[in-house]
């Protein structure tokens, strides 16, 4: 029986369209660092917080990021930016820190002319969005947190977590430029294990283009030592907390800890091993429905 995946083909065409049509803008953060940002789609604004490493153009073929940004851009004006030190934003920067990540989010809110909007927060973007929402409660109408965590590995109770954090940071800084099979290939396997071999291989290659070996070590240090547990009770915006049950990048108990500390949150778990969810994951349609339903309530 011949089967044709029309929906998948349509999604790929839409992603190519978004990637080709987007115009890269630049703005300055408080300390003068140049930040690259884009917008796709139309309608009420949604802004994506910085998460893991990325690249505004390459994100459209990132198996775990492309589905969610495509889905949201199909219905809303989605504003995204590359965090300092990676992607199309400035790489030569004096400071890569959690506070600067929050400053950068504020700078893009201003540059895009957004007074108030929901935030799409993936991975450590959930912590950045938390801090931003506490600093600017009137500007955040809601937060979607995917694969989020309030405590970096080095701040967790387990000695094994702390040891892994140090080992991973050292390996990233030392072996980021290695050829296949590289640490980047291992990361792709951990982040999106159910993506196709070709998708993971491409993602691993793209990571090399997203950030320098020096900056990945600095970047990882910030992620490993973040701690927003004291800020969670101060977030007034409604939060949708989405985590996969068998996520190897960030354990689901971090998602539960995140949700339990937020005064106005809803927690949903998915039967998946992915950290970010590819379109081929059987749980993706349910996650997409949950996200769009939440945004229908809270996007102005």
Short names for language-model regions:
Residues 177-222, 226, 231:
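Conserved alpha/beta-hydrolase catalytic His-Asp/Glu region
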Residues 235, 241-243:
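Short beta-strand/loop motif that positions the catalytic acidic residue
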């Amino acid at each position: 029986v011949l089967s044709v995946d029309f929906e998948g083909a349509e999604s790929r065409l839409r992603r190519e369209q978004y990637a080709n049509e987007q115009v890269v803008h630049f703005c300055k953060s408080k300390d003068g660092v140049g930040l690259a940002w884009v917008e796709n789609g139309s309608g009420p604004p949604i802004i994506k917080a910085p998460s893991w490493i990325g690249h505004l153009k390459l994100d459209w073929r990132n198996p775990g990021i492309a589905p969610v940004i495509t889905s949201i851009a199909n219905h809303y004006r989605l504003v995204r930016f590359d965090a300092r030190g990676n992607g199309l934003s400035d790489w030569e920067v004096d400071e890569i820190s959690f506070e600067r990540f929050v400053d950068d989010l504020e700078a893009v809110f201003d540059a895009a002319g957004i007074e108030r909007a929901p935030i799409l927060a993936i991975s450590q973007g959930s912590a950045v969005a938390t801090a931003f929402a506490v600093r600017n409660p009137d500007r955040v109408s809601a937060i979607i947190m995917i694969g989020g965590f309030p405590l970096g590995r080095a701040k967790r109770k387990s000695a094994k977590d702390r040891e892994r954090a140090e080992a991973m940071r050292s390996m990233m800084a030392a072996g980021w430029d290695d050829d296949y099979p590289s640490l980047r290939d291992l990361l792709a396997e951990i982040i999106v294990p159910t993506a196709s071999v070709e998708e993971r291989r491409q993602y691993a290659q793209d990571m090399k283009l997203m950030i320098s070996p020096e900056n990945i070590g600095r970047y990882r240090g910030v992620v490993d030592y973040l701690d927003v547990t004291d800020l969670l009770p101060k977030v007034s915006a409604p939060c949708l907390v989405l985590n996969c049950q068998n996520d190897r990048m960030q354990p689901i108990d971090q998602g539960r800890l995140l949700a339990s500390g937020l005064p106005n949150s809803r927690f949903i778990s998915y039967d998946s091993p992915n950290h970010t969810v590819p379109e081929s994951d059987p749980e993706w349609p349910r996650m997409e429905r949950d996200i769009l339903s939440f945004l229908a309530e809270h996007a102005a």
